[in-house]
Amino acid sequence: MNFLSAIESRTAQAASSGTTLLPQFRAPSWQTGMHSSTATELFVTGALQTSGTFPTSALTAYQHPNTFSSRNFATTPSLALQDGTFSAATNGLLSPHDPLLQIKTSQTPTALTFERIGSAVLSTSIPQSSTYRSAQESAPHLLQPQFSLLPSALGGTQQPAQPYSTSVFTGSTASIERALQRECSVIKHHQRPSSTQSVQAQLSGTQHSLPNYLTSVSGVSLHDASRQSSLLCAPLGALTHVSNGGPVQKTSQVSVELSQSYPSVIPSPGYPPSSTKSKNCPTKAPPRSSKTPKSQSVVSPELTQSYTKSSQNQSSVNSSQAQAFSTAQLPSLLSVSQPPIYVSTQSPNLPSASQSQVFSTIKTEKLPPLYKPLTVFSSQSQTITSGSQTLSYSSDQSLSLSSVSSETYSDQTRDLSSANQSQSYSSNNSQGLTSVSQSQVSYSSQSQVMSPVSPSDSYTSGQNQTLASPSLPFSTSSRGQNLSSSSPTQNFISMHPTPNTQDSTSPQSQKFLPSVQPSSFASSPHSQTMQNSRTTADSKSYVKRKSDTNLYASAKQEEKFQMQDLQALQQTALETATPGLSEGELNTQETAYSVSKADDRYSHSVIKSNSRMEEQVLGLQGTKKDERLISPVGHMPQHVGHLNNSASHDGKKNTDLIQSTQVSAKDLSQHTMLHKVLDTKMQEQPSTSPQLQAAMRHSQHLQLPGAQVLLDSGCDLQMFQQSMLQSNMGQTKPSAQMQRIQSPPQVAHPFLQMDGQIIQSNGAQSQQSLHAQGSDVIKMDTSNGKHLQQHLHTKDHFSHRGRLDSKNQFDSLNPMCFSESMLLTDERNFLSHVDDILAATAAQEFAKSSNEENLSVKNQDAKSRFQSLNVRHMSPNFTPPKPQNMNNLSINGSQSAVNLSTVSTTQPKNVSLDQTHIQPMEQDLPSGMVSPVPGANQDDHEKNSENIKNPPNVNQEPKEGGNIQEEVGDAEFLSNNKTLSEENTTTEGDFIMGGDENAALGQVQSHLSKIDPQAGGSSTIEMEEDCPDISQDGQQKGKDKMAIKQFTEDENANLKQIKRNMPLKRSVSKGPDVPGAQYSSHVSEGYYDSYQHQERMRQKIKEVEEKQPEVKTGFIASFLDFLKTGPKQQFSAPAVRVPSRVRRPCTPVIRPPCPGPLSPQSVAGAPVSDSGSASPPKKAEEDLKKNLETLPSFSSDEDDATVGNNDLQKSISTALSALDENSEKRLKTEGDKAALSAKQDPSTPRNGQDKTKAPESLKPSQPEATQPEQLAKSQETIAIEGFTDEENTESGGEGIYRERDEFVVKIEDIELLKEALCTGKEPPAIWKVQKALLQKFIPEIKDGQRSFAATNSYLGYFGDAKTKYKRVYVKFVENANKKEYVRVCSRKPKSKVLQPARTTHTKASGGSKVSETPPPKTAPPKVVSAKPKAKPQKTKAEPPPKKRKQWKEEFSSSQSDSSPDMQSDEEEFAPPPPPIVTRFLNTRAMKETFKGYVELLVGLTLDGDMMQNLEKENDDVLLPHMRKIEGMLNENRRRLLTKLQLEQPLKNALENYPDFAIISRETKSKSAACKIKVNGKWYNKKTLRPAKNPSKQSQEFPVEPEKSQLCSLYHALHHYKYHIYLKCKEEVSSVQKANRDLKQEELVNHCLKNIKWVEDLFEKFGELLSRVQQTCS
């Protein structure tokens, strides 16, 4: 059921795509009713049968990401929602209470499904979509119902779908029925069946095929519901009608009615009946499905007939049936694929039907019966293609094909249409969508409709031109591709065309795909199905592809593009689970299948999983696209050629591809269509020609990749980990399809089976091989070889097309992908990390998973693997590489093994083409990771795929089975890995690395390392920043980046080297950083090394666990840490943690301090730490402490830990230091340790701290040892309370006087202290008052001066004890080595007034915080000044020791210049560094001081003689505040003066005139002239009263522009007191107006009670000082 649900979710997403289409069709009605994007998509497919409009709409949806970059909302929301949808329903469909359902009218649901489809379409059709979407949400079949709607319109297509469903249902009838029941309930909620029925009836009337399909669909899952909701879905013309529930029997109006039907589908009212009927259908559907799985596909006409009845009933049922069908398909990822295959079978024209299927498939996972109908619909859609609905969804193409294109376009036109639409679609998913969006019957003329897909409008212009013959293009490529674009499956279609039209459609497809992919990951399943569809639609071309695998012979026939052949091929394709499709678009398809599978599972398991898959896929697509984007358009042609070559690699496909480079022959069946369309379109539309060509190129390269991407998206989301791994090669997916057909029961294992099926589907690519290989794994492997070829093609196509597309449409699309994928990625990463952590719990499991992962990575290629992981996090960047999706799986876990295989195979070709681009882009890395040599890669990949066949199984099992299975799979994986490493070393290398990393502690880390290389290669920078995985394996990341970069180049240069690197990476995985470094450098190190490494790691881990039992539980702790730190650390958290714990003894500290920079070193360090677990106790202790400090960051310590975790580290270190300081001995030993660590870890930032600590900590010990011999400089006088004659005079000397720090000395020791300081001998200790405690400060010698260092000894200070001590005045010298150093003042410092108030704060903060700040301060003074500056602001009442030290240093330099009076105040309050100032300003003491300053000025406004009176009385309350503030201002002013060399006249003017203005005039000369104008009344500086008027009221001075700001600051500082005085005057006057009877004191208090006003002044004061500090720094 998980798988079904995944498919359903995919379908829902695809449907949402359709929704977007509909709005463009029928903006008014659809928008409101089609909030469920999915439904809309389906509906569109059905409703827009004749016109390519709907497919175009889908295209818009897909395209819109590019076209409507601004529509990212759809994409992003859709991603999020999509995930939600998947998660909620587990189906990927929305559960009845799913937000999407609830959001019927909201755009979010649409966005959800649309996320994959395209934000533009989504946004357009959100309203419409909501209903449809709601239906989807309520039940998987809902999406299907939408599809049903389409199917209804395409009744003819329905039957084939049903047979397909049947086959699917055979395997999972029970689950399907369950799903159908659910769907039924959902349908009830949404009553879409009625609409579907009406559409069905209409379609039936107009096109028996479509009606049949509809009947078939509704029959399968929504017989009754269909009647209820028939009107809803069916009446294209009667959109309004939909509510009727009465089937609109305007089948003849299929085109129009479909359109209406779509709207009706959207309305939730109609949908509910559909749901109800759905229930009935589910039971029927399974039988039907089982009855005519492939047969019906083949017998599209028969199916049509047989389903005709159903169709009528099942108008609404269609939706549910679609779901049922999907459900049937669901049994395997292929199930999604299957409907597409069915569509393919139904008719190459029926790609749209296929699309429908795709959605159905998606839904099928959830509701087999419903999905079946959808599938059926898909098939019929082909027939109905001409029928309005064919275009609808699955039959966007189908529709075009059937109705519009079917006859004229059927062969050529259809091809063109497909190419066109595909192109238009791929060029800008939106483009295809544009037509669809038109969705008006207009779409019927595919060309226009494509254009109409406004979302793709902008895109459309480019692609639409291609679509200039949209109706035709839509029909041909449309089937798979256009439909994809037109319906929710637009994405899928796009994807499908991509595979089908590897060469010709690929560009469009991929273009579309990328855009759709991001927006409609849900479409991914669609895509997958769509892919099949497209394959089917391009059934000729795709069937050819199939024929490459199983239908290679047929493929050539398909090339003829005969409808029957196409249908037969489609059916065959369906039977083969789109093996042909998988062959050419296997990657796409497999991705799609993967998606369905993954979707289902992920939907069930976690939204994150789903979104992650989606994100990964998106990211991968984005990456690939990016890569492809990187490649110039010129490259696109190369890719196209390459694609053709790739197609030839596919085998028979090659001939066709070569024959029709435009069409891309078999492999590019759709591609050929695309090419034809392109050619035709070019002929038809010269203006479009360039874009079309580009699109064509894109489509060639895009189609496979596009399909892959879409499939990957869906696949990645749901199946990414398990299914993708299993279908590591695209082959797995075809295999799945085949398996689906062959063994529907496999659905029993929703996930494992899916994986197996997917593998079979991939095998289906090498259909014969897959079928021959009974086992999923074997199938996957076999298909792996072929799929690899196809994948290579795909990757090449994708690469080219991705790059072009990325540039053309994916620019906007990428952002969508990025946002979605990023969102999904984070969630998924989180989940996957959790899985990794759990897996890591057992070292063996870890090692196994590592092996598995390594295998997957190997298969995938370093590039793929890295990219996929990165894709997850950085979808946009990684999106380009299709293989990455599979890589993502590998990254997720053992799953990746299969993916790698596929990716490797597929990517190798791309590598050669992409390699060029890879270096420029992310793909660069992925490509590099794959195999640089296309030919060699192909062979290698084929071999690898075969070798991987078993590993994929293992991967699948681990995926499905969980950790246990992972272990088993890992075991197999290890053996397989060797083969992979040998044959496909490049891909294996990554996995190997992963394995080692897992062994080293972590699948997570291995994932990270894999990701990192990809990230480094693909978007090294972005990956690091955006990809949690990358950042997680910070060490690896750093190295991987470099390694990846090198690797990319190396890959391009040496395929073998890359392969070696992969194994190396595995071995390197030991050290998170090492893997990356070794990655590129150690090519020769083989899989064995990594395996041995894993073994060593296991042993070490075991040893560590024995020695440190906490290590076992450490994973839990690390997991918690991971939860705290976030997904970025997830991957590395488990992996790093174990090593981290093991390493802690060694040099873990190094890592946190220098995550990024030390990545290589830290990698080396990590292994060292692992090996060093048995290092000396001292070292272990030291490392332990360091580790504790690093703990917070050790998840992402490699890269992001430094910045993010510095605070945590410091706080931890502070806590440690506080504990350590309990004994002086500890401090000393700590100092020694610090010295050692400093020596050991010189490169780490921490080493700086250690160094500082070491010397400082050693110094304390030195003084004691050397005290007898050494004498400190003598100090004649000591400032002791009651003993000093000079009061309020500058004490002089170094250090900062802090009034709140109260130190005392025993009365009996005073004389001793004086004598000792005078002679330089060791004096008695002094004590710091800490509330009721006294902290002992022992004498030490620092720089020849006598100082006192803090200890952890305390005495009570209360009661009589207070009478035994006298206060001694000290200055804070520094805080080093976690110790506070002070010196006794020779004279009493001036500002003692505030001591009482501050002492309290100081005691608390001094005691508790001093220890904290000192540790951070261990860093070099400069660093400290920087960091403390930031921190100080947070600490309110504590003027941290760091700050004090800085003040000391900075003031010591300027003390001689400043007056003694100002110095002491300024030292504390006006530290030169602005950060210090701000920090200081944030302290309570500073606020109190400033408040006293304001109080004095307020009183001054009321009494002009107040200042003189205070001075006479020597006031110790307000004057000290005044002096402090003025001291700060004067010190800053002096600092400014040193920088601002003013002429005396200007200086005098600035100091005399209180008003200041800058007059700047622009002149023709190079520099603008600047004048300073000063004016205002002079005033007395003491009383602030106006003085005699100046001779001139104002003066102007010309100054350099850069000096004007300095003059402004100087003026503000000089007149600050006066300006505040004026503000106080204003405040007092305002208070007096309100309260005239207040006395002077009351007035002052009233003003000060205005806290906001006072704080505002305080903030501005701090800002002023900060500006000065920044200017002077």
Swiss-Prot record:
Regions of compositional bias (Low complexity) in chain numbering: 310-322, 411-458, 1452-1462
Polar residues compositional bias: what residue ranges? 289-309, 459-539, 947-956, 1259-1272, 1397-1411
Asked if the keyword Metal-binding belongs to this entry, the reply reads: no
State a GO cellular component annotated for this protein. Answer: chromosome
Location in the cell = Chromosome
Instruction: Give the residues annotated as coiled coil.
Output: none
- List, alphabetically, the Pfam families matched: DUF4211
Region feature Disordered, mapped onto this chain: 265-322, 411-543, 872-892, 923-961, 1050-1081, 1149-1182, 1216-1272, 1390-1476
Question: What segments bear the compositional bias annotation Basic and acidic residues?
Answer: 1222-1233, 1435-1451
- Annotated keywords: Chromosome
What function does the entry list?
Answer: Plays an essential role in the protection and maintenance of transcriptional and developmental programs. Protects many bivalent promoters and poised enhancers from hypermethylation, showing a marked preference for these regulatory elements over other types of promoters or enhancers. Mechanistically, cooperates with tet1 and binds to DNA in a common complex to inhibit the binding of dnmt3a/3b and therefore de novo methylation.
Q: What is the official name of this protein in its record?
A: Glutamine and serine-rich protein 1
Recorded source organism is: Xenopus laevis (African clawed frog)
